Amino acid sequence: MNISQIPLQVEALIPEITLTGFASLILLAGLLKLKNEVLVWSSVLFLVIFAFFIPSFEGEAFNGMFLNDFLTIYLKLIIIIGTIISLLVLTSYLKEKLIRFNESIAFILFSALGMMLLVSARELISFFLSFELMSLSIYVLVGIRRYDVKSNEAAVKYFMLGGFSSAIMLFGIAFIYGATNTTELSLILKVISNYNPLILIGLGLFIVGLCFKIALVPFHMWAPDVYEGAPTPVTAFISTLPKVAILGAFGRVLVEIFRDYYIDWSNFLIVLSIATMATGNFFALIQKNIKRMLAYSSIAHAGYIIIGVIVGTQSGFNSVVAYMFIYTLMNIGAFAMVIAFNEESIENYKGLHKFHPALAIAMLIFMFSLTGVPPTAGFIVKFNIFLQAVKAGFTWLVVIAVIFTVISAYYYLRIVMYMYMKEPVKLPEPIYSRELEVAILICTIGVTFLGILPLFLI
């Protein structure tokens, strides 16, 4: 049978089906007692090859329940690149902490699978199930250090609050179904032209459930404790890629499907954006632990990113996608540096450039990019979001965001000042591994090169 004649058009989901099989094999590989390096590099090689073939699978699957178009494929490539870097970062940590490789790698792959399905979903039940596949895998990853109390506490807290947010989102889907008699987004678009309070309630609950995962204030309380308690590579993973998937899917649903309710959801998101930028930046100022500082920093960045969704145009949404790509590189890179330095106290970063100049330069680049200092890529994507907001008439919101960006410079550049302008108080013992060095190099080159030559970022 020709592949184009497969019932329900499953060929568009062949990449996801292949990834499911590979992740299952990695999970079973523990029985074969393969070398850890074999598991890691075979996974990386698989994902690299996987990325080359993904653009070949455009179209619909399962009668329109999933859609692969240019934007979806772009989001999937970001997820794959982030997953590759996360696997490389995870490797050195697993070696150091003696954690089982096959389980950690498999659950990262299953989580990435959920994210890829999420950005393709064009039906609310498929959206929810993809969301849960991503979430359940992450809960396991957060608690992968089985005998670490902080890791276990973080996993339980994340699981309990995550389950609560999923219930709220599912309740919202039920309201939308009750008002439209369908869960297919294409059909919902046809029947929501008349203003319906039931749809508005459902949409509000749906947004609240998703806001939990991207840590928008006031749904952020889990983030600092979970980010601090989780293994550092897992923190890097969950602080970036789930946001790519959720904002990619969530932003598109709002902009394309619920356009008639733009005033309602945009006003709600404006309040959340301002509260998120304020809370994230002000709490980051007082942190002494770099993982908690980066946790609050990621909350603040969620506030900036949402501005692109608030714009409500395709160009605004495109700026969100570009921001998420660069945010993935610079945030995973920053957490990779925390692993490399093997030190979480900000005080102990003093004078690092004297003993580890290459690592200090990489950290400087990531801090500059997170701040939005030119010519880093972080400046380009933040400027692009602000530009789209100004064009849409949200100049006042951009002014507020710029003020908070200036505030953020204090805690980011404090790290740089400590590394270059303070005398060392403690000599860290960096963790060196081939995989970690490759990950840091990829992130550093990406953030620097795409800042000088933005290419597709604008």
Swiss-Prot record:
One of its GO terms (cellular component) is plasma membrane. The chain crosses the membrane at residues 12-32, 37-57, 70-90, 101-121, 124-144, 159-179, 199-219, 230-250, 266-286, 293-313, 321-341, 361-381, 393-413, 438-458. Keywords: Cell inner membrane, Cell membrane, Membrane, NAD, Quinone, Translocase, Transmembrane, Transmembrane helix, Transport, Ubiquinone. InterPro entries: NADH-Q_OxRdtase_suN/2, ND/Mrp_TM. GO terms for biological process: ATP synthesis coupled electron transport. The keyword Translocase applies. Pfam families: Proton_antipo_M. It is an enzyme of class 7 (translocase). Belongs to the complex I subunit 2 family. NDH-1 is composed of 14 different subunits. Subunits NuoA, H, J, K, L, M, N constitute the membrane sector of the complex. NCBIfam families: NDH_I_N. NDH-1 shuttles electrons from NADH, via FMN and iron-sulfur (Fe-S) centers, to quinones in the respiratory chain. The immediate electron acceptor for the enzyme in this species is believed to be ubiquinone. Couples the redox reaction to proton translocation (for every two electrons transferred, four hydrogen ions are translocated across the cytoplasmic membrane), and thus conserves the redox energy in a proton gradient. This is NADH-quinone oxidoreductase subunit N 1. It comes from Thermodesulfovibrio yellowstonii (strain ATCC 51303 / DSM 11347 / YP87). The gene is nuoN1.
